[in-house]
Amino acid sequence: MEKFANHFGYNRMFAKDQLTLGVHIPIENYQFHAPTMEKQVELVQKAEQYGFTGVWLRDVLLQDPDFGDPATGQIYDMMIYLTYLASKTEKIAFGTSATVLSLRHPLRVAKEIATLDQLFPERIMLGVSSGDRRADFKALGVSHETRGEKFREAFAYLEEILYKNFPSIQSTLGEVNGANLVPKPSKRVPTFITGFSQQNMDWFAEHGDGWMYYPRSPMHQAAAIGQWRELVEDYHPDVFKPFIQPMHLDLSEDPNERPTPIRLGYRTGRKALIELLNIYKSIGVNHLFLALFDGQRPADEVLDELGEEVLPHFPAL
């Protein structure tokens, strides 16, 4: 994509017909217990050394037993913890999966993202979404039913305030006249619509720099990617936009074990994992980040096996 021709983090992660790998925080097999959040700096540094290209964090406020996520994202605030981890690394990119624009004022998001991009140039990836956790919406006094409309308005505000000097913004979210956001990002921050964000596919084919969608089987994912890319071509002829997805992984000690489905992913040995990742690559997935939450083995042990045996097949670009 021409607008990212000289963007360091983007070009390590994304290229047409290529697949790179990332990791989901926490790098821990906590399953349905609260994670300890131990050794995350050490594990992220190890992931960087092995050639993983991205680290992804979630935007969650409250523990909600009805939602089934004891980690509440990664327990710590997404932006603060991202800053902490990024300060301990050198080149791996950090992404939000995803910043809930319906719950965060876009001016605050712009200030945070621009600051992060100045502190860690060309290493920030901005996933944005409308959100889905009712407890967070209720606690903030925000309507869950109108989150799609709020998302669109916040997205438009964010684009204006981040990339225009002294913009004129008239919005229900606020007005900007004769004022300017400082700092500005060092370059455009790659911005990915996450899920459908309560929009139709035409909207996020037109807007954003790529699409991040939930993990699904290759057959189902291929259909969605194909439909989306046809629409992208209609709105932006000859422009490449990357497709991103997470995948839960329970890596077997037996390298020859065949895949069996688990929640949001697969249990498999490494040989079949390489085959599976190549299938995802063939259908147009450009970056896949692995969540080790549901694994049976210690996460550091799994990370070593992935780094030594799987990453060489899907290196940084």
Task: State what each model feature region is.
Residues 1-17, 145-181, 214-317:
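An alpha-helical appendage that flanks or caps ligand/catalytic pockets
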Residues 1-88, 189, 293-296, 305:
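N-terminal beta1-alpha1-beta2 module of alpha/beta enzyme domains
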Residues 2-17, 69, 102-207, 226-227, ...:
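Internal, glycine-rich beta/alpha segment that forms the wall or movable "lid"
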Residues 21-25, 55-57, 94-96, 124-128, ...:
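Hydrophobic faces of well-ordered beta-strands that scaffold small-molecule active sites
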Residues 25-38, 99-107, 187-196, 258-271:
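Active-site mouth loops of central-metabolism enzymes
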Residues 35-47, 112, 193-203, 268-280:
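Short, acidic/polar
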Residues 47, 51, 59, 85, ...:
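Conserved, mostly hydrophobic/aromatic
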Residues 52, 121, 208-209, 285:
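A structural motif
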